[in-house]
Design a protein with these regions (language model features):
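Short amphipathic helix-loop junctions that connect adjacent transmembrane helices
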Residues: 2-18
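Hydrophobic membrane-targeting alpha-helices
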Residues: 6, 99, 133, 193-197
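Luminal/periplasmic active-site loops of membrane-embedded glycosylation enzymes
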Residues: 150-164
C-alpha cells in the first residue's frame, strides 16, 4: 500500500517504472524459494530459524524505507527493499504451508482452506484496511500540525499561491505520515522478531 502511494504520489513514477520493479520482486521470490528449498528442505533447518530469517528480511525492508524515504530517491535505490520484502514473504509462505503438512489427513483440507482464505482473502483486505485507516488518521494529524504556521500573519505565505501552498502542505504531510507509519511498523516487526528469538 505505502510503496505504491510513495512511488506514484511523491516520486512521480509512472506505470512503466512501477512495473519494471516487479522484476526485482520476482528475483526476490525466486531466490527466497531456492534458499528455502536448500536450507529448509535439504539441510532441515527449523521453522523458528526460517521464520527469524524471513522476519529479519521484512524488518530490513521496513527500516530501509523508514530511514531512506525522501523526495528524490532514485528508482535503483528501491531495488533492495523490494527484494528483501519478496524474499521474506516467500520464506514465510513456504514455511507456513509446510507446517500444514503435519495436520492429520482428515483435517488437512480444512486447514489448507482456512490458510488460503486468511492469507489470500481476509488477511490482505484486513491489513490494507488497517493501514489505510491509519494513513488517513495520521495524515490529518500531521497536516494540522504542519499547517500551524500557515496563516496570514506569516509574511512569507502571502507571496505563495494558495493552491501551491496547499499542495506542498499535503505532500509534506504525506511524507511525514509515511515515515511515522513505517516507524511504527518497524517497531511492531522488531517486537515480533524479538519474540521469535526469545522462544
Amino acid at each position: 500500500l505505502f510503496e505504491h502511494i510513495y512511488m506514484e504520489t511523491i516520486l512521480g513514477y509512472d506505470s512503466t517504472n512501477l512495473i519494471s520493479l516487479n522484476w526485482v520482486a520476482l528475483s526476490g521470490i525466486i531466490l527466497g524459494s531456492v534458499f528455502t528449498y536448500y536450507v529448509f528442505a535439504l539441510r532441515k533447518w527449523k521453522y523458528k530459524t526460517m521464520t527469524v530469517i524471513a522476519f529479519s528480511a521484512i524488518t530490513g525492508y521496513l527500516m530501509y524505507f523508514y530511514f531512506r524515504i525522501d523526495y528524490d530517491l532514485p528508482k535503483e535505490a528501491l531495488a533492495l527493499p523490494i527484494f528483501l520484502r519478496s524474499f521474506g514473504y516467500v520464506i514465510i509462505a513456504i514455511c507456513f504451508l509446510t507446517a500444514l503438512s503435519r495436520v492429520p489427513f482428515q483435517h488437512f483440507f480444512e486447514a489448507v482452506s482456512v490458510q488460503a482464505f486468511v492469507s489470500a482473502g481476509f488477511g490482505s483486505v484486513l491489513g490494507t484496511a488497517i493501514l489505510g485507516r491509519a494513513l488517513n488518521v495520521v495524515m490529518k494529524k500531521n497536516a494540522i500540525l504542519l499547517s500551524a504556521n500557515l496563516d496570514h500573519v506569516n509574511p512569507v505565505i502571502g507571496y505563495i499561491p494558495q493552491g501551491a501552498l496547499y499542495g506542498a502542505l499535503q505532500q509534506q504531510a504525506l511524507m511525514v505520515t509515511m515515515k511515522e507509519l513505517y516507524g511504527w511498523l518497524t517497531i511492531i516487526e522488531l517486537s515480533c522478531l524479538l519474540l521469535f528469538m526469545i522462544k
